[in-house]
Curated annotation (Swiss-Prot):
UniProt lineage: Bacteria, Pseudomonadati, Pseudomonadota, Gammaproteobacteria, Enterobacterales
TM helices/strands, residue ranges: 9-29
A GO-annotated cellular component: plasma membrane
All ranges on the Cytoplasmic side of the membrane: 1-8
Biological process (GO), any one: cytochrome complex assembly
SUPFAM superfamilies recorded: Heme chaperone CcmE (SSF82093)
Topology feature Periplasmic, residues: 30-158
Protein name: Cytochrome c-type biogenesis protein CcmE
């Protein structure tokens, strides 16, 4: 191999190694920002064709469901709130410290983001749907596939 080809080969190898390293670093940096979406029944029973995809403790995720009537417990001394999210086949407890959205109420559809701890979600953000007719696409798709008839479970009173 002459010197010219050897240099060309070294440049190509260096570029490929650099691209591989950059891709690895980007993936490592983004892994903490990836939030997977689950419904309460998927957290309890798993999802996929054989229900093998079950989230593990410490995993960051988003859970969407309806706030169970009678489950909201507020701590009078702090902003801590505990409530349960449900769908047709499961119930998951959520603990949250902070100010809840104005539209948060029992029977309302919400999405909570946080870390799963022993089957309960320790939430750091709660999002409430803004209109009775609006459902986030992720929740609507999950309800259509797994939980038919849940869209009209409870109409909020005014």
């Amino acid at each position: 191999m002459n010197i010219r080809r050897r240099r060309r080969l070294l440049v190509v190898v260096a570029i490929l190694v650099g691209l591989g390293l950059a891709t690895g670093l980007v993936m490592y940096a983004l892994r903490s920002n990836i939030d997977l979406f689950y419904t309460p029944s998927e957290i309890l029973n798993g999802r996929g064709p054989e229900h093998k995809d079950i989230p593990h403790p410490g995993q960051r995720l988003r859970i969407g469901g309806m706030v169970m009537p009678g489950s909201v417990k507020r701590d009078p001394k702090s902003l801590a709130v505990e409530f349960k999210l449900y769908d047709a086949n499961g119930v998951v407890s959520v603990s949250y410290v902070g100010i809840l959205p104005d539209l948060f109420r029992e029977g309302q559809g919400i999405v909570a983001e946080g870390v799963l701890e022993d089957g309960n979600l320790s939430g750091d953000q709660v999002l409430a749907k803004h209109d009775e007719k609006y459902t986030p696409p992720e929740i609507e798709d999950a309800m259509k596939q797994n939980h038919k008839g849940l869209l009209n479970v409870s109409e909020p009173t005014r």
